[in-house]
Amino acid sequence: MSNLDSTHHFDVVIVGSGGAGLSLALSLPSHYKIAILAKSSLTEASTFYAQGGVAAVLDKTDSIQQHIDDTMIAGAHLCELDAVKQTVEGGRPSVNFLLKHGVEFTLDEDDQLHLTREGGHSQRRIIHAADATGKAISTTLVQRAKEASNLTIFENFIAIDIITLHKLGHIQQDNRAVGLYVLDEQNEKVHTFLAPFIALACGGAMKAYLYTSNPDIATGDGIAMAYRAGCRVANMEFNQFHPTCLYHPQARSFLITEAMRGEGAYLRLPDGERFMLRFDERAELAPRDIVARAIDYEIKRLGIRHVWLDITHKSAEFIQQHFPTLYTRLLELGIDITKDMIPVVPAAHYTCGGVVVNAQSQTDIEGLYAIGETSYTGLHGANRMASNSLLECFVYGLSAAEDIQQKFEQDFNLPNIPEWDDSQVTDADEDVVILQNWDELRSTMWNYVGIVRTTKRLQRALHRIEMLKREITEYYQDYRVSKNLIELRNLVLVSEMIVRCAMQRKESRGLHYTLDYPELEQQLKKTVLTPPNFEVKQIPVNTL
């Protein structure tokens, strides 16, 4: 990549190489010139690590309305109904899109798509590729992207900021995204990417927490960049903690799929008690927020480090057939899941809030789209239901593709854009400053803004985050950009969003549980942050 010019012109630039970004890229006409920016390797995206599957109404005993109802219940009724309908109705077209591109899903004995069940779903409606669905989808779509002659892939290219007309001084015009500044990590050079259409499909922000199931790329880049560009964000207080992350010193980010509980696994305490029956009549199949809170409660009550997930009452053949990846990986760690229970703890897993978008994935800024975990469509409400997230990626990726085609003009004139200027900065003198701030931020978020919150904890968190942000901002202004500095700058901004939204919500709903306000409020409101000064307000759901 060292011979690249520093300025690149494309029709569409997509930040992110997971399911959301690749579904958009592969749905656009083949004569569009498209860039895909991957922050790491192409498959290093949350999609790759998704074990569960894609929720879709395919069985004749199931219905669109049942899937809508299940989603609304899981989301504590804070979901935007139009978004839920659009997503659920897009289930079959999304599955057809994946099949068309060659994704091989698990079939049943009749050679039909095998459907499993996960927490919150009243029916079997999860299509999957054994217990490694994300890997099957990711590797297939990546291969199709590599085969497409109109797609140019840039690996290890990290977006820094969005270029808009207003940032360039064209205040009299309606604001519009026209490009990005991007760091080529290998050559330590900042490039300018220009395009009339830019899509942020770069995942969530759960690296804000000390313990997470997410890959290292999940630093909230898209959410932070969009906010700095002038886009509203919403519902950042709702962060999902997956109930069952493996507790093992050699595998800190290893997720134990929800499908294991869907297929009958029990959660147990050290004395063998199946404790979920005390918390919810659905037991292990209760929504994730309820299960995660129950585990957190028992860990704190008993002073233990983890609970146990037990599927040993199923036959070895059943376990190896349904969970081949898990069986093999855990065996390598000395755990035979046909005989041994699995030590599990909750871990930060999914960002339910994000950049506010419409049905076409369009943000507040013309030409700028946000798709997947980066976005707030309103689908998830106060809690995401299992396997709705991959579905959302494809539904809104295809929707964004349609919108771009309708607005596409080949003679679109981009203004003159200055190259990145780092003449006034120097190389960082001590990277230990970044490392220290990174660790302090993630510990603060885990201890004060975790599964159970209080007003005092949130106030303490905000105080520390504001101090860290000042320090990081000074560092960013004084020194040459690096991957770690870009990520830390984004993560501290998104962490502040999470805390400010959490402080605004005076109730316990879904994933936001506070001891100071344990009851539900009557009105259903979403929390919206408006840039640049964190103007925060709550407005009724199903309104703009």
UniProtKB/Swiss-Prot annotation:
It is found in: Cytoplasm. One of its GO terms (biological process) is 'de novo' NAD biosynthetic process from L-aspartate. Its cofactor is FAD. GO terms for cellular component: cytoplasm. It catalyses: L-aspartate + O2 = iminosuccinate + H2O2. The active site is at R288. Keywords: Cytoplasm, FAD, Flavoprotein, Nucleotide-binding, Oxidoreductase, Pyridine nucleotide biosynthesis. It holds the Pfam family Succ_DH_flav_C. Binds 1 FAD per subunit. Disruption phenotype: Knockout mutant can grow only in a minimal medium supplemented with niacin (nicotinamide or nicotinic acid). Pathway: Cofactor biosynthesis; NAD(+) biosynthesis; iminoaspartate from L-aspartate (oxidase route): step 1/1. One of its GO terms (molecular function) is L-aspartate oxidase activity. Gene3D superfamilies: FAD/NAD(P)-binding domain (3.50.50.60), Fumarate reductase/succinate dehydrogenase flavoprotein-like, C-terminal domain (1.20.58.100), Succinate dehydrogenase/fumarate reductase flavoprotein, catalytic domain (3.90.700.10). Its EC number is 1.4.3.16. SUPFAM superfamilies: FAD/NAD(P)-binding domain, Succinate dehydrogenase/fumarate reductase flavoprotein C-terminal domain, Succinate dehydrogenase/fumarate reductase flavoprotein, catalytic domain. FAD binds at residues 17-20, 39, 46-53, 221, 373, 389-390. The record marks E118 as: Important in orienting the L-aspartate substrate. Catalyzes the oxidation of L-aspartate to iminoaspartate, the first step in the de novo biosynthesis of NAD(+). Belongs to the FAD-dependent oxidoreductase 2 family. NadB subfamily. This is L-aspartate oxidase. It comes from Acinetobacter baylyi (strain ATCC 33305 / BD413 / ADP1).
